[in-house]
Amino acid sequence: LHDSGLVDVLRQVGQPLLGVCLGMQLLFERSAEDGGTECLGLLAGEVVPIPPAPGVRVPHMGWNTLTTVREDPLTTGLPDGTRAYFVHSFAVPVTADTLQTTEYSGVWSAVVRHGNRWGAQFHPERSTSAGSRLLTNFLLEVSP
């Protein structure tokens, strides 16, 4: 994306954007994956590995609960305790753009927003009604 000039286009375009799982991670400035990778830089922060801990498997594959940090139209109908399905080995620490968190060997951003750029670390397509709600909220928020 950098070589083709698309990163600059994405930074300048005003169209709403929703990144899911790796797509959310790509919204940030940098990832520790593969020894360090520059990402899109649309949101401030770095993607880091989920640290090993007793009883914690990496990659994280399974259902976890969401906890609201701040309200947003994207998370309407997704109260604290809502369960969502995650598959990831890297995660985004809580930032000023975090809307909801999840806990797995630490507390991580589960849903983020900065302007018209949103991200969900979990998989809406696997998260049944919670995933449908998030996608519906996104479409309602960005529809004219």
Go through each PLM region and give its residues.
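Residues that form or flank phosphate/diphosphate-binding pockets in enzymes
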Residues: G35, V94-T95, S129-A130
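Short amphipathic alpha-helical segments and helix-helix/interface helices
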Residues: V7-R11, T75, L135
